[in-house]
Amino acid sequence: VEEKSSGVGSLKALQPLLGDDTTVSAEVEILGSRMVLGRVVEKLKLDIVAVPKTFPLVGGTIARRYVGAEPNQPVFGLDSYAWGGEAIQIDSLDVPKDYLDDPLELIAGDNGTYAIIDVDKQTVLQGAVGVRANNKGFSAFVVQLKARPGTHFRLTRRSAESAIDAIRSQYAVKERGKKSGVLELSLLGGDAAQINLILDEILNTYVRQNVERRS
């Protein structure tokens, strides 16, 4: 496997056991299949989206450039936005079917507490880091939350279909050159580490599936 990455995308090359053009085409299909990508979504929990809510236009740039150990102080007094140094990790998130793919927001509280609100600003769940929270079909297990109290995070529980489609919209597989037998996998995005993690898991899943097919 060869790889080349940057802040906006990553490229990896794979030379599987390919015999002819038909096999190459079949392997390309497998690498982009719902079976492979679905396993990647499940393994990496890509159906859970949780990112700091930054101020439009300039907020993202300010947050990316911040290098302090603790969350940055709010700019312009806008303390509901994230200004850098925030972190969140959610191990599990379940919502009622009607809320799949709908935007939610998680608001950090004091001492590791949080509240989740829906688009109508209604609180649907309250909890604390390290403790599973449940309420009327909503369930969450937050394992890390680093933010000033009052900071908002964008939160979405994607359906499997939309999580797979999100990968496919930025993902491509093709043969490098003509009859080379080398497949190139590329993925675009804003987080180089996350991109490489996804591509690595696609490759690992593909290899495992090949082993299963041949056993």
What role is predicted for each listed range?
Residues 1-23, 116, 124:
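Short, glycine-rich, amphipathic interfacial segments at transmembrane boundaries or analogous
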Residues 2-6, 34-36, 43-46, 111, ...:
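Solvent-exposed coil/turn segments that connect beta secondary-structure elements
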Residues 8, 196-197:
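Solvent-exposed, non-transmembrane alpha-helical starts
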Residues 9, 23-26, 35, 99-103, ...:
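Extracytoplasmic
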Residues 18-35, 189-193:
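Soluble non-cytosolic domains of exported or imported proteins
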Residues 22-23, 176, 182-183, 190, ...:
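A short, surface-exposed, charged and often Trp/Pro-enriched helix-loop connector in the C-terminal portion
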Residues 37-144, 148:
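Alpha-helical transmembrane helix bundles of large polytopic membrane transport and channel proteins
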